[in-house]
Amino acid sequence: MSYTVLHRDDLPRDESTYEFVGSQHEDTEISFIWVDMRPGGKIRLHKHPYKEIFIIQEGIATFTVGSTILEAHAGQIIIVPAEVPHKFMNLSGKPLKQIDIHLNRQFITDWLEE
């Protein structure tokens, strides 16, 4: 039996995210983004050719999914269908922590806003 242990700090990152790309880790079937976003942070409008699942761990996220605006709280899961434009932001005064699961071996993103 073989297995892999990774540490979050070993993943590629930017200011508020760590990225796990499945194709770079024994061709794992999914990719995910580990989000730790400061108050006021946001991800601009985009879409993917596969479903994306957001697991809200701490804080509150304001999502736009298609034409719907919703507030997601810790403990909630948001499932966005393939090809549906979406974005989110942290409008609260506290950090937002969530896991964004991409049902694909790599990230494929069509950015719809600059």
Whereabouts are the PLM-identified features?
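Short acidic-glycine-tyrosine-enriched beta hairpin
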Residues: 68-82
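A generic "binding-loop/recognition-motif" signal
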Residues: 39, 49-50, 68, 84-85, ...
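A short hydrophobic beta-strand segment most commonly corresponding to one strand
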Residues: 79, 94-111
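Conserved short histidine dyad/triad with adjacent acidic residue
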Residues: 33-48
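Short beta-strand His + acidic residue motifs that chelate non-heme Fe in jelly-roll/DSBH
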Residues: 45, 63-64, 80, 86-92
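Well-ordered beta-strand scaffold positions
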Residues: 35, 60, 68-70
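A short, N-terminal "cap"/entry segment at the start of jelly-roll beta-barrel domains
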Residues: 1-30, 111-114
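Glycine- and acidic-residue-biased ligand/ion/polar-headgroup-sensing regions
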Residues: 51, 56-61
